[in-house]
Every structure is written in structure tokens, then in C-alpha cells.
């Protein structure tokens, strides 16, 4: 049996024979046993990404006041170049990308953890759009898989959605479309 420990299976004991079964994700192996052992969840880097937003510094400082290790990446030409720079600045398996022209939702805690048995995904959180009174993925905080961003050579019109993604049904921020 392959044994997992922790709420999101972030500690795994894998038998040697499992290698021949796993193609895409650990769930390919037919004998997975989830244990309820408490395991400390890793934290992921938080990176505020901006370009020339007038309130970039203010929004960054608001996040940094609550999350002291948050980093700022700004002034990079082109979205993909900016995402790749965020990935280079990160030292964790995943990193949170917060768009500087949005305000963090009160109570959003950056504590989501991917299921470690699944293949890597980017995780898109909902963003509230006050212009239409609706929350959806556009401009939401994204939990990027660092290596997937660094390794990207080809992508479609939307960089993030060119790779495996999951939408997380949680409002992370409010967009400011007026900047």
C-alpha cells in the first residue's frame, strides 16, 4: 500500500512497485491508503505582481503588513515574463500571485494546499468584480505551480489556462478595474 499522511497528503510513503503504475498522478496507483496523521503544512511564497498601478505600493504594503514575507515584482514587460519572474523569485513548490490592482478579501488566509497525490495544477481563486456584482476567476489570486511556470515554452491566449487548472470556490480579492 501507498500511505499518505496529512490533510492534503503532503507526506507519502511509496512502495517501489508503485513507480510502474503512476503515469500522471499518484492516484493512478490502485492501493492508496490515507492516514489521518497530523503533518505540518508547508507555506508558499506570496508575490504581489504589478506593472504601473497607481495604488501598487499601497496594496503591497497592506498585504505585507499581514504576511511579512510577501515579495513585490513590478515593472516587467509582458504577462508571461512577469509570471516567470515571480516563479524565479519564489523558493517554494507553489507561489501565490496577487495582482496589485486588487484588494485582498478580508479573511483570505493563503492557507489552501493542493492535494499532493494529484498532478500539479494552477489554482485560480475567485475575484469579486464590483462593476457587475459577481465573483469569478478573472483577476483572482492564483496559486501557481512554480516549476510549471518556469518550464513553460508554449501557451495559448491565456497563459494560466494553457496548463492544468482548478477553480477554487473562494473569493480571494476585489478587483479595481478603474486603474
Which residues does each predicted region cover?
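Catalytic-site signature of metal-activated, phosphate-bearing donor transferases
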Residues: 2-38, 111-179
Amino acid at each position: 500500500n501507498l500511505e499518505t499522511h496529512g490533510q492534503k497528503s503532503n507526506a507519502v510513503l511509496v512502495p517501489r512497485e508503485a513507480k510502474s503504475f503512476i503515469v500522471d498522478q499518484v492516484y493512478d496507483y490502485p492501493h492508496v491508503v490515507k492516514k489521518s496523521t497530523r503533518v505540518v503544512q508547508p507555506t508558499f511564497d506570496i508575490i504581489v505582481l504589478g506593472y504601473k498601478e497607481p495604488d501598487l505600493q499601497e496594496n503591497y504594503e497592506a498585504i505585507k503588513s499581514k504576511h511579512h514575507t510577501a515579495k513585490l515584482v513590478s515593472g516587467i514587460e509582458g504577462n508571461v515574463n512577469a509570471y516567470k519572474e515571480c516563479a524565479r523569485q519564489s523558493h517554494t513548490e507553489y507561489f501565490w500571485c496577487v495582482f496589485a490592482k486588487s484588494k485582498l478579501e478580508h479573511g483570505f488566509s493563503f492557507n489552501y494546499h493542493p492535494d499532493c497525490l494529484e498532478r500539479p495544477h494552477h489554482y485560480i481563486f475567485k475575484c469579486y468584480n464590483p462593476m457587475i456584482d459577481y465573483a469569478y476567476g478573472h483577476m483572482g489570486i492564483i496559486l501557481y505551480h512554480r516549476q510549471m511556470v518556469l518550464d513553460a515554452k508554449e501557451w495559448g491566449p491565456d497563459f494560466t489556462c494553457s496548463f492544468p487548472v482548478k477553480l477554487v470556490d473562494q473569493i480571494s480579492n476585489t478587483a479595481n478595474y478603474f486603474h
